[in-house]
Curated annotation (Swiss-Prot):
Forms part of the ribosomal stalk which helps the ribosome interact with GTP-bound translation factors. Is thus essential for accurate translation. InterPro entries: Ribosomal_bL12, Ribosomal_bL12_C, Ribosomal_bL12_C/ClpS-like, Ribosomal_bL12_oligo, Ribosomal_bL12_oligo_N_sf. This is Large ribosomal subunit protein bL12. Gene3D superfamilies: 3.30.1390.10, Single helix bin. It comes from Agrobacterium fabrum (strain C58 / ATCC 33970). One of its GO terms (cellular component) is cytosolic large ribosomal subunit. One of its GO terms (biological process) is translation. Belongs to the bacterial ribosomal protein bL12 family.
Amino acid sequence: MADLAKIVEDLSTLTVLEAAELSKLLEEKWGVSAAAPVAVAAAGGAGAAAAVEEEKTEFDVVLVDAGANKINVIKEVRAITGLGLKEAKDLVEGAPKAVKEAVSKAEAADLKKKLEDAGAKVDVK
């Protein structure tokens, strides 16, 4: 029984690539196909990637278009970023550009609402 526990422990330390290679070797040795388990493992890998994306904590607020009310958007950009008038105007006229980068989800939503209320089209990435 101790040998089985050691095998389980050794298998637990394998990387995904090593486990896939082990699977291929066992298929060749035993003359079987493990198509269904491989598909389940691939689906598990995709789920892990989706979980990582859901846990994103930093967002960029991107000004896509200033819209018709450019002056209000420039004022709001100045208030948000602390830029001078010329720098804020250049940022607004150079859209699409990031207004703020690496902000929390709540702050990104707040900034998006403020800019949209001023008349801008905003994207959060």
